[in-house]
Amino acid sequence: MANSGLQLLGFSMALLGWVGLVACTAIPQWQMSSYAGDNIITAQAMYKGLWMDCVTQSTGMMSCKMYDSVLSLPAALQATRALMVVSLVLGFLATFVATMGMKCTNCGGDDKVKKARIAMTGGIIFILAGLAALIACSWYGHQIVSDFYNPLVPMNVKYEFGPAIFIGWAGSALVLLGGALLSCSCPGSESKAGYRAPRSYPKPNSAKEYV
């Protein structure tokens, strides 16, 4: 039968990773202005996220502007946004399903085998959520690297990795690991066999027979 400690560890890791994915999706620091070469900006720092771009002054004040048009955004940014939204929705669904299937909860009935299968289903959904987020962050990171080493892109508009993309990678890893631990909670074949009555063997005939 599934180990409740393993289930709790996997669920905690997956939930923590999902919270990290929510945070990285919301904050605008997916890429930040580069300081390579002669592109040294001391008065302000520029950030770009999935939904807005921001400028932070040397005084600490930040001003942000939402993207005006969805159709004018690059294809990589639109795909990243879509994958992150899918990841968050799957993570929310996986949290609900896994909670019902964990041994330490009273949801999902008293059938331990059924609850273990529900927890395994939640783990699989967590894995799908982690994969979607990992693909999104890696795709976005690849685009940053391509633009950084593109000689046609001026130095004053080059960007580097921001904190959000590292949070996304870490969150994806936690969600994947947590989902894998939850998926290992599937009951073994011994739990499916159920109770078997002991076999009864015929008693040996006695040496003497009485009439």
From Swiss-Prot:
It is a multi-pass membrane protein. Coiled coil: none annotated. Residues 210-211 are annotated as: Interactions with TJP1, TJP2 and TJP3. One of its GO terms (cellular component) is plasma membrane. Phosphorylated. One of its GO terms (molecular function) is structural molecule activity. Residues 190-211 are annotated as: Disordered. Residues 29-81, 139-160 are extracellular. Keywords: Cell junction, Cell membrane, Membrane, Phosphoprotein, Tight junction, Transmembrane, Transmembrane helix. PROSITE patterns: CLAUDIN. Plays a major role in tight junction-specific obliteration of the intercellular space. Belongs to the claudin family. This is Claudin-7. It comes from Bos taurus.
